[in-house]
């Protein structure tokens, strides 16, 4: 019973990851590399869903997609919730307000 409940709780996250994987396999090869960030937006989405679950991961993914345009940012941008510290590109901790 516990195992079934655990799978049911993870199901939304797994479905969203599956949709991103489908995009990576079907559409992404035809669009070419257009993402300005590292990791790419689709890899970011998968990481966000794995680390934060379906709801927070979806919020982070939409926020990232809205920032990924020619006049937006670029560079290293790992998934992190809005009030968390995150490592700089060189691996040292860096608070969000320091950027």
UniProtKB/Swiss-Prot annotation:
It is a peripheral membrane protein. InterPro entries: Membr_insert_effic_factor_YidD. Its main location: membrane. One of its GO terms (cellular component) is plasma membrane. Keywords: Cell inner membrane, Cell membrane, Membrane. It is found in: Cell inner membrane. It comes from the Bacteria. Pfam families: YidD. NCBIfam families: membrane protein insertion efficiency factor YidD. Could be involved in insertion of integral membrane proteins into the membrane. PANTHER family: MEMBRANE PROTEIN INSERTION EFFICIENCY FACTOR-RELATED. Belongs to the UPF0161 family. This is Putative membrane protein insertion efficiency factor. It comes from Salinibacter ruber (strain DSM 13855 / M31).
């Amino acid at each position: 019973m516990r195992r079934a409940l655990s799978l049911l709780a993870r199901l939304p996250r797994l479905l969203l990851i599956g949709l991103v994987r489908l995009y990576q396999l079907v559409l992404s090869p035809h669009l070419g590399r257009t993402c300005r960030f590292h990791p790419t937006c689709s890899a970011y989405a998968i990481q966000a869903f794995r680390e934060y679950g379906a709801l927070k991961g979806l919020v982070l993914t939409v926020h990232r997609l809205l920032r990924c345009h020619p006049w937006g940012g670029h560079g290293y941008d790992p998934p992190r919730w809005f009030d968390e510290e995150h490592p700089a590109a060189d691996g040292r901790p860096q608070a969000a307000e320091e950027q």
